[in-house]
Regions:
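Intrinsic, low-complexity N-terminal interaction/targeting segments
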Residues: 57-76
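Acidic/histidine-rich, surface-exposed loop or edge segments in extracytoplasmic proteins
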Residues: 79-87
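Surface-exposed interaction/gating patches
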Residues: 93, 161-187
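Hydrophobic, ordered structural segments
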Residues: 94-112, 122-162
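Bacterial N-terminal signal peptides
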Residues: 8-20
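Boundary at the C-terminal end of the N-terminal hydrophobic targeting segment
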Residues: 21-25
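N-terminal secretory signal peptides that target proteins for export/translocation
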Residues: 1-6
Length: 187
């Protein structure tokens, strides 16, 4: 149990905080092929695949929620010798949760949390945190088999969202004391 927690914490730190040199040991091409979508190599030997739910039109209190704001599924792999650790966060609709969860359990992928970030959305969206350890391509294939039970797009995105948005970004920057950036129509 402590070994699993240590591995999980090291992946979280590597994915979010590490600035060490790139040290990819895995064959991420096999992961991309098995999953059906490629990702990018991150610092700390992490291979991350973004899976934004661009197929969903989610509305919260009359406001459309953009995928870049709160609908971004992702998976991150890190080599552990000839094995890999994977963790991620899958954005799912209510009707997708049960079949995806069942398939992941059958394939030996752990569900570490199921919750929602946004109340009152239509459709309702849920966030399933996952974790697995094993052969990288086998993990990716298991995740693919679960994701195809949802409508999560597994192809490249259709292009970048406009870089201009209708916000006073200078005021936001001054107020926060930091410069932001536009990403997928979100600042």
């Amino acid at each position: 149990m402590i070994s699993s927690i240590t591995r999980l914490l090291s992946l979280v730190l590597a994915a979010g905080l590490s600035t060490s040199a790139l040290a990819v040991e895995g064959d991420w091409g096999q992961v991309a092929q098995a999953l059906g979508k490629s990702g990018s190599e991150m610092p700390g030997g992490v291979y991350r695949i973004g899976l934004p739910r661009t197929d969903l039109k989610v509305v919260l209190d009359g406001v459309e929620v953009k995928p870049a704001l709160a609908l971004g599924s992702w998976l991150a792999f890190r080599s552990e010798g000839d094995q890999a650790l994977v963790m991620g966060d899958l954005v799912l609709t209510a009707d997708e949760v049960s079949p995806v969860m069942q398939k992941l359990a059958e394939e030996g992928i752990e569900i570490t949390a199921l919750h929602n970030h946004l109340l009152r959305t239509a459709p309702a969206t849920f966030y399933m945190h996952v974790r697995g350890f094993g052969g990288p391509a086998k993990l990716a294939a298991a995740l693919h088999d679960a994701l195809v039970l949802s409508k999560t797009p597994l192809t490249a995105s259709s292009g970048a969202a406009p870089s201009q948005i209708e916000l006073d970004t200078a005021l936001i920057d001054r107020t926060l004391g930091a410069k932001g950036r536009v990403n997928g129509g979100v600042y």
